[in-house]
Curated annotation (Swiss-Prot):
Residues 26-147 form the Avidin-like domain. SUPFAM superfamilies: Avidin/streptavidin (SSF50876). This is Avidin-related protein 4/5. Glycans are attached at N67, N93, N141. The gene is AVR4. Disulfide bonds join C28-C105. The keyword Ligase does not apply. GO terms for cellular component: extracellular region. Forms a strong non-covalent specific complex with biotin.
Length: 150
């Protein structure tokens, strides 16, 4: 019994072999300008050789929205992975609060970069008896607005 392979099937397999490496080789990059599901805007400057980065964060939400100002962020990422994990801290200039984010940079099925994050927001309280309400937890998904020239 002789099996024959369709020329169309061979062409499809050859195409997949040529295209697949370029899909997996694409690396998700934190550097650039991002927006989240709430409308906040974050800019991450170039990541250095140790994986460290700085940037700015302009939140769209706050307890006192009239006082919102651009705030600095400082972070680090794993550099070897094509979809790296990372963490950063935002020091809010307009309140006695700090937020830490941790997440991963993904390339979705459409080839778009997305940052999936979880965060802890710690607000200052005047007495230890109010500690129970000083930390909030949540998540944000960020999508790229544009890249930042290095």
């Amino acid at each position: 019994m002789v099996h024959t392979t369709s020329p169309l099937l061979l062409l499809l397999l050859l195409s997949l072999a040529l295209v697949a490496p370029s899909l997996s080789a694409r690396k998700c990059s934190l550097t650039g300008k991002w927006t989240n599901n709430l409308g906040s805007i974050m800019t991450i400057r170039a990541v250095n050789s140790r994986g460290e980065f700085t940037g700015t964060y302009l939140t769209a939400v706050a307890d006192n929205p009239g006082n919102i100002t651009l705030s600095p962020l400082l972070g680090i990422q794993h550099k070897r992975a094509s979809q790296p994990t990372f963490g950063f801290t935002v020091h809010w200039n307009f309140s006695e609060s700090t937020t830490v984010f941790t997440g991963q940079c993904f390339i979705d099925r459409n080839g778009k970069e997305v940052l999936k994050t979880m965060w802890l927001l710690r607000s200052s309280v005047n007495d230890i008896s109010y500690d129970w309400k000083a930390t909030r937890v949540g998540y944000n998904n960020f999508t790229r607005l544009c890249t930042v020239e290095e």
